[in-house]
């Protein structure tokens, strides 16, 4: 089995928001045991959904859950900069096009209990690939193997892929960048995703200016109190 290693800079970045995503993980657990296959999307690109997907998957794995992170943003994957391969890898598009077995695309990582399915090469027909029988076949095959499956999807405000993926998921989460996207666009994205039949689990407000709002700044909680003593 091919091994992927999360690069040090990304691991350090995830460490800074560890408590924030631990809180999100806890909220997901409280939302119901049935919510184990989750699609993560955003309105536009660059809002941090891939980073959020990775951080959430890390939090779940570090909490003791066997977790699979699937990079389904096959049009514009950024996870190749997060996980580096120790050898030649095949990814999701290889499997969906019938050029790889499921076992060929699930990669171990240097994080215990975390496995990853890379996106693979950019296909000429991303939406059509997701709509073929292989995607649902994959979900059926792995859903009882892992405690949680986190799927990073393309932005729903740009392409319909995220809604197609969400149709096979228990729920979805919207990631939005603070101060960038108007509320009506976020609401429209939520409605588009809900049309898939998937359950809306919440919004992750990303890239918050901490000089303006420090809510969620869990990393400093307790440190200020210790300094006062």
Swiss-Prot record:
Q: What is reported on the regulation of this protein's activity?
A: Dephosphorylated and activated by CpsB.
| Keywords, ordered alphabetically | ATP-binding, Capsule biogenesis/degradation, Exopolysaccharide synthesis, Kinase, Nucleotide-binding, Phosphoprotein, Transferase, Tyrosine-protein kinase
Matching SUPFAM superfamilies, A to Z?
P-loop containing nucleoside triphosphate hydrolases
Q: What class of enzyme is it?
A: transferase
Q: Reaction catalysed?
A: L-tyrosyl-[protein] + ATP = O-phospho-L-tyrosyl-[protein] + ADP + H(+)
Work out whether the entry's keyword set contains Transferase. yes
Q: A Gene Ontology molecular-function term?
A: non-membrane spanning protein tyrosine kinase activity
Q: What does this protein do?
A: Involved in the regulation of capsular polysaccharide biosynthesis. Autophosphorylation of CpsD attenuates its activity and reduces the level of encapsulation. May be part of a complex that directs the coordinated polymerization and export to the cell surface of the capsular polysaccharide.
What protein is this chain from? Answer: Tyrosine-protein kinase CpsD
Q: Which organism is it from?
A: Streptococcus agalactiae serotype V (strain ATCC BAA-611 / 2603 V/R)
């Amino acid at each position: 089995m091919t091994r992927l290693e999360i690069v040090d800079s990304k691991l350090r970045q995830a460490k800074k928001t560890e408590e924030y995503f631990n809180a999100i993980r806890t909220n997901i657990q409280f939302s119901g045991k049935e919510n184990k296959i989750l699609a993560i999307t955003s309105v536009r690109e660059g809002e941090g959904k891939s980073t959020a997907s990775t951080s959430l998957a890390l939090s779940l794995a570090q909490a003791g859950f066997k977790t699979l992170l699937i990079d389904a943003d096959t049009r514009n994957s950024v996870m190749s900069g997060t996980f580096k391969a120790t050898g030649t890898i095949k990814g999701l598009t290889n499997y969906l096009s019938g050029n790889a077995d499921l076992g060929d695309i699930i990669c171990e990582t240097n994080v215990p209990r975390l496995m990853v399915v890379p996106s693979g090469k950019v296909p000429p027909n991303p939406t059509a690939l997701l709509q073929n029988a292989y995607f649902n076949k994959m979900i059926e095959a792995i859903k009882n193997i892992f405690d949680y499956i986190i799927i990073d999807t393309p932005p729903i405000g740009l392409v319909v892929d995220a809604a197609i993926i969400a149709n096979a998921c228990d729920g979805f989460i919207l990631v939005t960048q603070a101060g960038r996207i108007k509320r009506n666009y976020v609401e429209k994205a939520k409605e588009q995703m809900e049309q898939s039949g998937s359950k809306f689990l919440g919004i992750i407000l990303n890239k918050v200016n901490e000089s303006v709002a420090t809510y969620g700044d869990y990393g400093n909680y307790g440190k200020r109190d210790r300094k006062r003593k």
